[in-house]
Amino acid sequence: SESDVDVCVMLRDTFHTDYAQGKGREDYGFKASDFTFQEYRNLVKKALQDKFRTEYVYDGNKSLKIDENTYHVKADVVPSFQLRNYYYENSLDPNKYIEGVWLQAKTGEIVKNYPKRHKANGIAKNNNTNYQYKKLVRIMKHIKNEMVEDKKTDGDKITSFLVECLVYHVPNNVITGYSTWTETVKQAIIYLYNEIKDGHHTEWCEVSDMLYLFRNRKWTDEDAEQWLVTAWNYLGYGE
């Protein structure tokens, strides 16, 4: 987000699950809970209002927003349930799972992600590119933000998260192979455009490697391809 601070408040006592194939709650000794996500979100909101005063705390779609004042900075607080993924490693052990987060947006959209794996994979790629990967991510996000401000792209579809995931799929030798950022950005756009155009992107995942990037998302591969073309022209590479 564009806030100064992002905080996830995850509840572990109540959790959602992706079970191993053919398995269910009873196989792991779990019981259903009647504690809803909306009840939890309301409790977190009340706690924030008690701490920061009601007029500074309000609902966003996925997060609770805290406005800045002279005593604290602007923040996004994301209430979530723990997500336990047993499916990925076909685990039948209740204590062996990949941890993610599960939340329900105000629109009703169910959101799952895996921030710990996202972070670990991002660090690994950054290390393997001599710390150039995260720099390229920042540059590409900045370009995207400027394009949104100039009304050259749709920020609701071309999100910062999508941009980061696209850059994650740029090969390390492309990220490290050029002496200027101008050329690196140019070659990254060329690579991504060609891969999507040729259909080599269908198995791409998020940075976490847990969820497909172009399946059942609010963006499509056509959106990403069009953004790359628009960015190419926006940066003057086509001149």
Regions found by a protein language model. Give the residues of each.
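Catalytic cores of NTP-dependent nucleotidyl/adenyl transfer enzymes across multiple folds
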Residues: 32-202, 206, 225, 229-237
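Catalytic metal-binding acidic patch
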Residues: 1-37, 41, 77
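C-terminal helical/tail subdomains of lipid-metabolizing enzymes
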Residues: 218-223
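Short helix/strand-capping connector loops at secondary-structure junctions
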Residues: 202-216
